[in-house]
Structures are given as structure tokens and as C-alpha cells.
């Protein structure tokens, strides 16, 4: 049987309620909600830092395989109608695409930091691509 948390209940004793001090009355102005507890929330940025550490540790692919495969086939269909792909070829394309995106986001983050910001913007990505010598 699972343990349950016991909450304190008001007694129905014979003593009459005493007058509360002003400071105590101000503290207890919000009515008790019958033991309903607010869900725990981390401070802003804590979860983001945890996710950064998690994804920097991992080596697995971050983009789902089937949507990426559909995208590759859709782009290839514009050039030639009857193209077939080995699964290893799609996997190699996905590895290369994710490596490119990670590098681009690293450079974009450096551009945002250079502008004394922590939030990346479109102009940071455009600057990173321009410095790399890519056309956009």
C-alpha cells in the first residue's frame, strides 16, 4: 500500500478562538485550500541549463529519423523523380545535417554573446553565416 501524506486538521475542541495579532492575521489572510499543493517549479534557467548538459553529453541523433527521411526524399524528388536511398545514406545525411546545425548554433550563440545578449536572434544567425562565407 502506498504511503500518503497526512495533513493537519482543525480540531473541534471546546476552547473558544482567541483574537489573532495583526501580523498573524495578515499572514493567514489567504484561505487554506484544503491541502492542495502548488506544483514544484524550478527557477528560470535551471531547466535550460540541465537540458544543455544533457544534450552535450549525448551522441544520439536529435531529429526524428522518419520526418528527416521524408524531407530528404521530398527535396530529392525535385531533382529526379525515381531516386532510391540506402538507409545508411539517409543516416549519413542526417549526421552531417545535425553536425552542421550544431556548429551553426554555436557560432550564432557567439554572435549573440558578442552583442552582449544571451538570446539568439535571426540577425545572429545571418551574421554567423556571412562570416562563414555562406550565401543566404
UniProtKB/Swiss-Prot annotation:
Instruction: Keyword check for Hydrolase, yes or no.
Output: no
User: Per the database entry, which stretches of residues form a coiled coil?
Assistant: none
CDD domains per record: HFD_H3
Q: What is expression of this protein induced or repressed by?
A: Highly expressed in growing cells, but only at low levels in starved cells.
Checking InterPro entries in the record gives:
Histone-fold, Histone_H2A/H2B/H3, Histone_H3/CENP-A
* Protein's cellular compartments: Nucleus; Chromosome
Question: Describe its PTM?
Answer: Phosphorylated to form H3S10ph. H3S10ph promotes subsequent H3K14ac formation by GCN5. H3S10ph is only found in the mitotically dividing MIC, but not in the amitotically dividing MAC. H3S10ph is correlated with chromosome condensation during mitotic or meiotic micronuclear divisions. Acetylation of histone H3 leads to transcriptional activation. H3K14ac formation by GCN5 is promoted by H3S10ph. H3K9acK14ac is the preferred acetylated form of newly synthesized H3. Acetylation occurs almost exclusively in the MAC.
- Region ranges (Disordered): 1-43
Which residues are annotated as modified residue N6-acetyllysine in the UniProt record?
5, 10, 15, 19, 24, 28, 37, 57
A Gene Ontology cellular-component term: nucleus
Pfam families according to UniProt:
Histone
**Superkingdom classification of source:** Eukaryota
Q: Where, per the database record, does this protein carry Phosphoserine?
A: 11
Q: Which UniProt keywords apply?
A: Acetylation, Chromosome, DNA-binding, Methylation, Nucleosome core, Nucleus, Phosphoprotein
Residues that the record marks as modified (N6,N6-dimethyllysine) are: 5, 28, 37
Q: Assembly state and interactors? A: The nucleosome is a histone octamer containing two molecules each of H2A, H2B, H3 and H4 assembled in one H3-H4 heterotetramer and two H2A-H2B heterodimers. The octamer wraps approximately 147 bp of DNA. Interacts with GCN5, whereby H3S10ph increases histone-protein interactions. Interacts with PDD1 and PDD3.
* Protein name in the entry: Histone H3
**Species the sequence originates in:** Tetrahymena thermophila
